[in-house]
Amino acid sequence: MASLQANATSSLQYQTAPLESSHIPGSPHSVHVLLEGYSKDVGGDLFQADGSVTLIQGPLTVLVDTAGPWSRDSLLQSLQNQGVAPADVTHVICTHGHSDHVGNLNLFSHAEILVSYDLWRNGYYVAHDFRAGVPYVLPGGEGLEVVATPGHTGSDISLLVPGTSLGTVVVAGDLFEREGDGDSWQPLSEDPERQEDSRAAILKVADVIIPGHGPPFRVIKHGQLAQQETKNN
């Protein structure tokens, strides 16, 4: 990720497009959005929100974010619908420590747990230098990689999932609120400048982004756009 960040400020031409399905098959990894995040202005100073929850299945069974505690029953039912019990989950990755992303961690106490830059394995804290831009490669994960994407908070992380039918999927938490979020994410950001750099870095490598509070979307780069136009002509 360090090399990505070094090039993050260079221009990138791309388009986004909605993804029609919450399931992305692939080998060695498939991705399923169990709960789609949302954020609603309900009037006054009140918002109603919950974070997306994503299941990655392959050599490991990985859950990214756990939603808020108010979504416990929905999360358990969604896992059950996929034939997954909480005890089957090998790794839980929380993109940051806000309550709508970590609210059900207690369901997965046996799993390796990564919350922001803090990694726990078998009840022990394991040091990892995310602040220096060192990615965390999940052992046995066949390319699953956690990278630092600070900005929304000072220690946000994202999971890179290669080997799907649509290419590399990035589960990005609140790095992206939703497709086409424009500048609306900036008031929610602890450090908008760093977040802008993190967003640019992820856009360079992602074919699909799963945001924190909206449906997944495709990222179509300039070269891909040119190829599509050639095919259409």
Swiss-Prot record:
Catalytic reactions on record: a ribonucleotidyl-ribonucleotide-RNA + H2O = a 3'-end ribonucleotide-RNA + a 5'-end 5'-phospho-ribonucleoside-RNA + H(+)
Q: Which cofactor does it need?
A: Zn(2+)
Q: Which GO terms describe its molecular function?
A: metal ion binding; RNA endonuclease activity
Which Gene Ontology terms of cellular component type are present? cytoplasm; cytosol; nucleus
Q: How is the cofactor bound?
A: Binds 2 Zn(2+) ions per subunit.
Annotated Zn(2+) 2 binding lies at 100-101, 174, 213
Compartments, as annotated in UniProt:
Cytoplasm, Cytosol; Nucleus
InterPro entries documented for this protein: MBLAC1, Metallo-B-lactamas, RibonucZ/Hydroxyglut_hydro
CDD domains per the UniProt record, alphabetical:
MBLAC1-like_MBL-fold
What superkingdom does the record give? Eukaryota
> EC number(s) of the enzyme?
3.1.27.-
Q: Which GO terms describe its biological process?
A: histone mRNA metabolic process; positive regulation of G1/S transition of mitotic cell cycle
**Which residues hold Zn(2+) 1?**
96, 98, 152, 174
Entry annotated with the keyword Lipid biosynthesis? no
Broadest EC class assigned to this enzyme: hydrolase
Q: Which Pfam families match?
A: Lactamase_B (PF00753)
**Keywords, A to Z?**
Cytoplasm, Hydrolase, Metal-binding, Nucleus, Zinc
Q: Does the keyword Secreted apply?
A: no
Similarity remark? Belongs to the metallo-beta-lactamase superfamily. Glyoxalase II family.
For domains, the record's comment is: Contains four of the five characteristic MBL-fold metal-binding motifs, with two waters completing metal coordination.
PANTHER family, sorted: METALLO-BETA-LACTAMASE DOMAIN-CONTAINING PROTEIN 1 (PTHR23200:SF48)
Subunit structure comment from the entry = Homodimer.
What's its job?
A: Endoribonuclease that catalyzes the hydrolysis of histone-coding pre-mRNA 3'-end. Involved in histone pre-mRNA processing during the S-phase of the cell cycle, which is required for entering/progressing through S-phase. Cleaves histone pre-mRNA at a major and a minor cleavage site after the 5'-ACCCA-3' and the 5'-ACCCACA-3' sequence, respectively, and located downstream of the stem-loop. May require the presence of the HDE element located at the histone pre-RNA 3'-end to avoid non-specific cleavage.
Protein's UniProt name: Metallo-beta-lactamase domain-containing protein 1
Organism from which the protein derives: Xenopus laevis (African clawed frog)
